[in-house]
């Protein structure tokens, strides 16, 4: 970068499947956090001059959800609708952060084992549509480790679209041992919709799914012992909680509170053949060199919104202790700000002086094209 660009703060944008977290490098929290949603009206507008738009993004889409069809352009961490994604980035830059993207280097994030075309297209849109001076794509779990102040550990990052385990030793990610699981918050929301329907509460539309997501975030928790908790729920009403729907109707939920997140440990609940998050973590550690496993066991870092359930750290501790050698010291680190730790790590990374030579500049992009991203970003 030339001297004239030093005063430009980098933008950090963690575009998750469920929430976009964006802000400026060096800040300790994101300025803007809004749902990664684009909504389109599902009815004909009849009142003239109301300035009705053909699409709404983020919080505005959320507040008008009763008349909109909501779509998430990112599914399982992969961008599936680029036009809508451009709308989201446009909204982030111009409406939320109120910056001119051509003046700020931009750090984006993605899940590991994403299709190569995904980050190439991200790079292309940043340089060609938004004309950013420089950009970089970082792996989400690696940023979470930065945020926790460690250089060694295994990160279990679970968001809305994808969960992944990334073992990192002395700052090096170990790509052969990365485990990715396409089971995350959105699948849990869908499962909760299903089991609430069995109780006689019907949730079907894209807008009602948002209500269920709110129920999930407010009332769900992870049981330490699932069978025992089921027995408790069956024999008493002590675990029941009530929730008021937007129309004033009150619903009661009992064992659904912990049956929903239990799916993380037993994916067979939603018909997936995969191992649970405790097993993927263990398998990931076992794929690493025998000499570094001890350090990974002692530094299990949780990150992402789907690790926010009460009880999840204790349950992880219990499950991994059962799998690991009996003498092994196991520590689960669950930082309170872990919902945003990917963003915080990005903010730290983008403001390091040593990182400044890592950016992909506009000039490099013009010379090499979108594939430059595989050479310059891990």
UniProtKB/Swiss-Prot annotation:
GO terms for cellular component: cytoplasm; cytoskeleton. Actins are highly conserved proteins that are involved in various types of cell motility and are ubiquitously expressed in all eukaryotic cells. It comes from the Eukaryota. Polymerization of globular actin (G-actin) leads to a structural filament (F-actin) in the form of a two-stranded helix. Each actin can bind to 4 others. It catalyses: ATP + H2O = ADP + phosphate + H(+). Belongs to the actin family. Pfam families: Actin. It is found in: Cytoplasm, Cytoskeleton. This is Actin, muscle. It is an enzyme of class 3 (hydrolase). Its main location: cytoplasm.
């Amino acid at each position: 970068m030339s001297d004239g660009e030093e005063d430009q703060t980098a933008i950090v944008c963690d575009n998750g499947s469920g929430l976009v977290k964006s802000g400026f490098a060096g800040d300790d929290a994101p300025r803007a956090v809004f749902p990664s949603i684009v909504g389109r009206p599902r009815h004909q507008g009849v009142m003239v001059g109301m300035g009705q738009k053909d699409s709404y993004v983020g919080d505005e889409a959320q507040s008008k959800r009763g008349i909109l069809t909501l779509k998430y352009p990112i599914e399982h961490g992969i961008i599936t609708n680029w036009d809508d994604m451009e709308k989201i980035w446009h909204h982030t830059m111009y409406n939320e952060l109120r910056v001119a993207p051509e003046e700020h280097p931009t750090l984006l994030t993605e899940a590991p084992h994403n299709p190569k075309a995904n980050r190439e297209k991200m790079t292309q849109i940043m340089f060609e549509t938004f004309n950013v001076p420089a950009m970089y794509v970082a792996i989400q779990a690696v940023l979470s480790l930065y945020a926790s102040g460690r250089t060694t550990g295994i990160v279990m990052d679970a968001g809305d679209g994808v969960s992944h385990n990334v073992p990192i030793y002395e700052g090096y990610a170990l790509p052969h041992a990365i485990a990715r699981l396409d089971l995350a918050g959105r699948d849990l929301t869908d499962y909760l919709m299903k089991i609430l329907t069995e109780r006689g509460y019907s949730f079907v539309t894209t807008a009602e799914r948002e209500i269920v997501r709110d129920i999930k975030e407010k009332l769900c928790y992870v049981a330490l012992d699932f069978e025992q908790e089921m027995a408790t729920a069956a024999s008493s009403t002590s675990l029941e909680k009530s929730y008021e729907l937007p129309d004033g109707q009150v619903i009661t939920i009992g064992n659904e509170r912990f049956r929903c997140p239990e799916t993380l440990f037993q994916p067979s609940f939603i018909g997936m053949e995969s191992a649970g998050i405790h097993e993927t973590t263990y398998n990931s550690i076992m794929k690493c060199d025998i000499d570094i496993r001890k350090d990974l066991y002692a530094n299990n870092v949780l990150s992402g919104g789907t690790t926010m359930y009460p009880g999840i750290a204790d349950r992880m501790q219990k499950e991994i202790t059962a799998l690991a050698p009996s003498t092994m010291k196991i520590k689960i680190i669950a930082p309170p700000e872990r919902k945003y730790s990917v963003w915080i790590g990005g903010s730290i990374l983008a403001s390091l002086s040593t990182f400044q030579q890592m950016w992909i500049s506009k000039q490099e992009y013009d010379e090499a094209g979108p594939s430059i991203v595989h050479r310059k970003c891990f």
